[in-house]
A protein has these predicted regions:
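Noncatalytic, solvent-exposed loop/strand surfaces
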Residues: 1-329
Length: 329
C-alpha cells in the first residue's frame, strides 16, 4: 500500500502488506486490482488471493484476514465497500480443480463477506446460492438498508446488518463486471457477456423476484466492462463494441448512440456537471449530459489506462500502467 502526498505526488510511505503466490488471471488484471477504501481511520485493501488487510495512516498494518481462499481464472476484479463499521467484499470465484465449475457451471461457493472494520473478524457471510464468476463492486440502496450485489448470474439484495439474502434475480451471464447504478427508484444492472442484458429492477421484493420486479429490459447498449452511470434522467452505458449509449432511465429507450475511439475499461464519472470518459489509450472525453451527444473537450495523457479515475477536491487522479496523475485547474 502506497501513500502519496496529494499536493505534489511525493511518496509519504510504502508498506509491504501481503505476499501471495502467482496464479492465473487476464492479462489486463493484476494482483492488487481492487480499489482500497478508507473510513478516515484505516485504509482497507483486498488482494488477489482473497486476503483483506487494514493499515493505519502511518502505514502500520493493523490487521489481516485470509478467511477466503479466492481463486478465479480471471483474477479478482471487485472492490470492497464500507458499511456501518464493516468492510464488505464479494468473492465470486471458480474452482481450482475443474475450470468449468464456477465459470461456466454454477456452484454454491460464492459469498459476500463482511468483516469488522476495527479488528478484521468475520461479521457475516452472505450466501449467493448457485451462481457463477463475477467481478462486481456492490452498492448501497434504500437509504443504506440494502446491499445490492451482482454475481455471475444473480443480482441480489442483502441486509447489510446480518447478511441475510432478501431477494434474488436470475441474470444470465458470467464474468459480469459493471457495478449497478441507482436512480428514479430503480436499480440498473448489466450482464455484458454470454447473454448481454441491461435491466432496471424495482425494490421492495422478497425471494426470487425475477418474474415480478423487472421494470424494463434492454438487449442493446449493454455495458460489458465499465460500470453504468446515472445522471438524471438518463443512464449512460458503454457497450462491448465501444459505443456510448444514452438511455432514458425510466423506460429503457435509447436516446442516442455515439461510437467512441479506443477501448474502454474505466468507468465513466460525473463531476461538476460534466461526464468524463477515459479510454485505455489515455484519452479523456468530456461531455455535457443531455438528450444529444455534446462533447466539450478531449484530453490525451498518452499513457495506458485501465483503472477508473478518482475525483476529489476539484482534482482528477488517474492511475495509468506506469504513472499516477493529478489533473486540476
Amino acid at each position: 500500500v502506497i501513500c502519496v502526498n496529494r499536493k505534489d505526488g511525493s511518496v509519504a510511505w510504502n508498506t509491504e502488506v501481503h505476499r501471495q503466490k502467482p496464479g492465473p488471471m487476464r492479462k489486463q488484471n493484476s494482483y492488487a486490482t481492487p480499489t482500497p477504501v478508507t473510513d478516515g481511520k484505516y485504509v482497507y485493501s483486498v488482494f488477489y488471493d482473497g486476503t483483506v488487510a487494514a493499515v493505519d495512516f502511518s502505514g502500520k498494518i493493523v490487521w489481516k484476514n485470509s478467511e477466503v481462499k479466492f481463486f478465479s481464472l480471471h483474477g479478482l476484479g471487485a472492490s470492497p465497500i464500507l458499511v456501518n463499521g464493516q468492510v464488505i467484499m464479494p468473492f465470486d470465484g471458480s474452482s481450482r480443480e475443474e475450470n468449468q465449475v464456477g465459470w461456466k457451471i454454477p456452484w454454491d461457493k460464492a459469498i459476500v463477506l463482511s468483516l469488522d472494520a476495527e479488528n478484521g473478524s468475520v461479521r457475516w457471510k452472505g450466501q449467493r446460492g448457485e451462481s457463477r464468476v463475477g467481478h462486481v463492486t456492490p452498492i448501497l440502496v434504500d437509504k443504506g438498508r440494502q446491499l445490492v450485489s451482482a454475481g455471475g448470474d444473480r443480482v441480489q439484495g442483502f441486509d447489510p446488518k446480518t447478511g441475510k439474502r432478501i431477494w434474488s434475480i436470475y441474470s444470465q451471464g458470467e464474468g459480469v463486471t459493471p457495478s449497478p447504478a441507482v436512480g428514479d427508484g430503480l436499480i440498473y444492472t448489466s450482464s455484458g457477456f454470454e447473454a448481454p442484458t441491461l435491466r432496471a429492477i424495482r425494490l421492495g421484493g422478497k425471494g426470487d423476484v425475477t418474474k415480478t420486479h423487472i421494470a424494463w429490459e434492454q438487449k442493446r447498449g449493454v455495458a460489458a466492462l465499465s460500470s453504468l452511470l446515472y445522471v438524471k434522467p438518463y443512464l449512460y452505458s458503454i457497450s462491448r463494441d465501444n459505443i456510448l449509449h444514452c438511455i432514458e432511465a425510466s423506460s429503457g429507450k435509447i436516446i442516442w448512440m455515439e461510437r467512441l475511439s479506443g477501448v474502454h475499461w474505466a468507468s465513466p464519472v460525473y463531476a461538476d456537471g460534466r461526464i468524463y470518459i477515459l479510454s485505455e489509450e489515455g484519452v479523456t472525453i468530456v461531455l455535457r449530459p443531455g438528450a444529444k451527444y455534446d462533447e466539450v473537450a478531449r484530453n490525451d495523457i498518452g499513457d495506458t489506462c485501465l483503472a477508473s479515475m478518482a475525483v476529489s477536491q476539484g482534482n482528477f487522479y488517474i492511475r495509468s500502467a506506469q504513472h499516477l496523475y493529478c489533473i486540476g485547474n
